[in-house]
Amino acid sequence: MPLPDFHVSEPFTLGIELEMQVVNPPGYDLSQDSSMLIDAVKNKITAGEVKHDITESMLELATDVCRDINQAAGQFSAMQKVVLQAAADHHLEICGGGTHPFQKWQRQEVCDNERYQRTLENFGYLIQQATVFGQHVHVGCASGDDAIYLLHGLSRFVPHFIALSAASPYMQGTDTRFASSRPNIFSAFPDNGPMPWVSNWQQFEALFRCLSYTTMIDSIKDLHWDIRPSPHFGTVEVRVMDTPLTLSHAVNMAGLIQATAHWLLTERSFKHQEKDYLLYKFNRFQACRYGLEGVITDPHTGDRRSLTEATLRLLEKIAPSAHKIGASSAIEALHRQVVSGLNEAQLMRDFVANGGSLIGLVKKHCEIWAGE
């Protein structure tokens, strides 16, 4: 399928997607009933969309195009109420978190969807292993060239986004020692990590043509890069965050990305170059492994800085942009989080360290989501 022309969209508008866990009490393992829930809510959603993701234990909540985080929060809140009621009617529960702490990938059923079934044929068991749960944020762009500039700019802050959203310390019944283990699942995919270097939209079109020759890539949705342009929507999509445990944190993360995008495209402080990516995977690893305690290295100067310090600097830089687009509340909340030194991964570990079980952890996450 050829790459569509870049659809011009209003700059800095938002679209947010949350991949949620569908769980089956009282054992709190993943359920295989997302299709049933989607059928139950499809005529009750007035704004946004509830839809499938890769496997039957995943439920995606997606906003419409939103002006700001307040509009997105309102849409999510309304969807949340409908989904929670449908889940209760079917004796199911819903929660966030980047991974389910003890599910077995072998039990996961891929959705009866043509694209997902084709992906299963291409990637085999890797698709079942990809039963992990992330937050994706789309930001509107006025042109393809702006999208490429924004993609490179946001890529500088991938470690910051990962560290702030880290919520997947447990996997397959084990403490992984990572703050965010979810991104590791995609390491075997041939398109894992950053997009190959291009400097403008014309070069991106040539890159996509080359990738399509592999027969594995039919559309932009078949690419699993950390950040990717989405020409159909006219956006850049950031895909590195774990799904948070609360809607409020999800909205705050979206506000962070929206404000960072506004700052990048209005200030244009960076002259991007391929060398910017020289230490990308090392810095990304630090964020996944250690969260805000990780240390990132500047590929140009060799300077090293903790992610705590780097994130506080970012929040300070983008504060004026956040004020202009109505995202100041998000930046203030994230600042408090960084100063406190806590993220959701650490809260999960604290629960288990205090005698909680992994079953109890999922139950608590469901209570958090339902009680917000």
Swiss-Prot record:
One of its GO terms (molecular function) is ATP binding. InterPro entries: GCL_type2/YbdK_subfam, GCS2, Gln_synth/guanido_kin_cat_dom, YbdK. Its EC number is 6.3.2.2. It is an enzyme of class 6 (ligase). It comes from the Bacteria. GO terms for biological process: modified amino acid biosynthetic process. Homodimer. NCBIfam families: gshA_cyan_rel, PRK13516.1. HAMAP family: Glu_cys_ligase_2. ATP-dependent carboxylate-amine ligase which exhibits weak glutamate--cysteine ligase activity. Belongs to the glutamate--cysteine ligase type 2 family. YbdK subfamily. This is Putative glutamate--cysteine ligase 2. It comes from Escherichia coli O127:H6 (strain E2348/69 / EPEC).
